[in-house]
Amino acid sequence: MIFSKISQVAHYVPQQLVTNNDLASIMDTSHEWIFSRTGIAERHISRDEMTSDLAIQVADQLLTQSGLKADAIDFIIVATISPDATMPSTAAKVQAAIAATSAFAFDMTAACSGFVFALAMADKLIASGAYQNGMVIGAETLSKLVNWQDRATAVLFGDGAGGVLLEASKDKHVLAETLHTDGARCQSLISGETSLSSPYSIGKKAIATIQMDGRAIFDFAIRDVSKSILTLMAQSDITKDDIDYCLLHQANRRILDKIARKIDVPREKFLENMMRYGNTSAASIPILLSEAVQKGQIRLDGTQKILLSGFGGGLTWGSLIVRI
């Protein structure tokens, strides 16, 4: 049988740094108010780089680190809710920029679960035997979706990108998987609506910026995500003691605190970086993974079991247990 493994990781964030104090100068908020509720102290905001620019930086790093030629890449998946345009896809721009002429490329839209969903799909593509090498990148410029007059949401989000290179392997590395969607609760977190605009249309005004029912999302993350992780471990016969690190979507420190207690995993196993990047949606998990590799916490030698878990708009949530 053929399996997939993560062989390389990379991340990139825009240079512009915006602190909580910077935000306090343009809206009614403070560092203390933001940090005490979210654990976020600063975030990176793009001045002129588009989502594809961030993703291209990551793709270039992955190629350089791997030593592969661009034409060895079979597919590129970019998870994003903030593409440059509806078409072409952000992934198509990445494919062109790195001259991966043999690769097919497409975007995945699953909000903050996007990287986990895309990684699960990429694993199946390689397991099919038809493809050997693929890139999975989460990239966002959420700053263009934020209502900068709404302090409840504007303080939460940042821009950035992270990704992995997947290669074929004779050994199984994706050990367990669970993916979920509940469209009945989709109105809890929305952005980027478009209006019907033909001469024959009568429609409501679209909501372009991020709108969130914070309490509903907070409760959803604690209840549904915790339950799915516990079910995943039980079904796969993997215990909490088997897990080396938990890399969850970086939405809010209090969410991580409560999930850690719910699944009874030591809090120190939960890596976090939301204090420096904010919520980067589909980019948050791969950025966290890349930083953990840089710090030597995760070794990429196939000896550690890592829980990856994303949750967000859709509503979507999903988890993978991966040997890295």
UniProtKB/Swiss-Prot annotation:
It is an enzyme of class 2 (transferase). Coiled coil: none annotated. Pfam families: ACP_syn_III (PF08545), ACP_syn_III_C (PF08541). The keyword Protein biosynthesis does not apply. One of its GO terms (cellular component) is cytoplasm. It is found in: Cytoplasm. Keywords: Acyltransferase, Cytoplasm, Fatty acid biosynthesis, Fatty acid metabolism, Lipid biosynthesis, Lipid metabolism, Multifunctional enzyme, Transferase. Residues 250-254 are annotated as: ACP-binding. The keyword Membrane does not apply. GO terms for biological process: fatty acid biosynthetic process. InterPro entries: ACP_syn_III_C, ACP_syn_III_N, FabH, Thiolase-like. Transmembrane segments: none annotated. The active site is at residues 112, 249, 279. CDD domains: KAS_III (cd00830). Pathway: Lipid metabolism; fatty acid biosynthesis. Its EC number is 2.3.1.180. It comes from the Bacteria. One of its GO terms (molecular function) is beta-ketoacyl-acyl-carrier-protein synthase III activity. Homodimer. Belongs to the thiolase-like superfamily. FabH family. The last Arg residue of the ACP-binding site is essential for the weak association between ACP/AcpP and FabH. Catalyzes the condensation reaction of fatty acid synthesis by the addition to an acyl acceptor of two carbons from malonyl-ACP. Catalyzes the first condensation reaction which initiates fatty acid synthesis and may therefore play a role in governing the total rate of fatty acid production. Possesses both acetoacetyl-ACP synthase and acetyl transacylase activities. Its substrate specificity determines the biosynthesis of branched-chain and/or straight-chain of fatty acids. This is Beta-ketoacyl-[acyl-carrier-protein] synthase III. The gene is fabH.
